[in-house]
């Protein structure tokens, strides 16, 4: 709700975490030629610092358009880092994290006590894919993991399964508290 209050650079960096579940290090090292359109699909090429490898993943059209405007507005060349440090190199994760925490505090996100954990968005995206019945292998490839075991650790499936089981239980005839109260009222008459 308050993202529009953040500096433009932080907004764009955050959108890559939130929309795509990229690692913060991947966002910090994006270059001007990272975005492209192929037919009707939009893509990003990301250098995975941790894996020392490139990956290509689909992105929402809206993010593609936002970033094309950002690149043009800031005259970022294809081989330049998009989010630069003061010397023109890649933005450091520590700087990004500090700036995000400060922006969250200034804008009273969670009463100024929000703890920015960039990696949590990777878990959220993985869980969203899993809940949408995307195969574990596809999620692994999307996240850039080598092994499925690592991907399994990213899927926060237990809370959703517990919530679903809870909902199913209370939807059963006679299981809701309201039905018990009504039953007691009838028995008391």
Outline where the language-model segments fall.
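Catalytic-site neighborhood detector that most strongly recognizes the C-terminal catalytic loop/helix
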Residues: 48-52, 143-171
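C-terminal secondary-structure termini that scaffold catalytic or DNA-interacting sites
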Residues: 87, 167-189
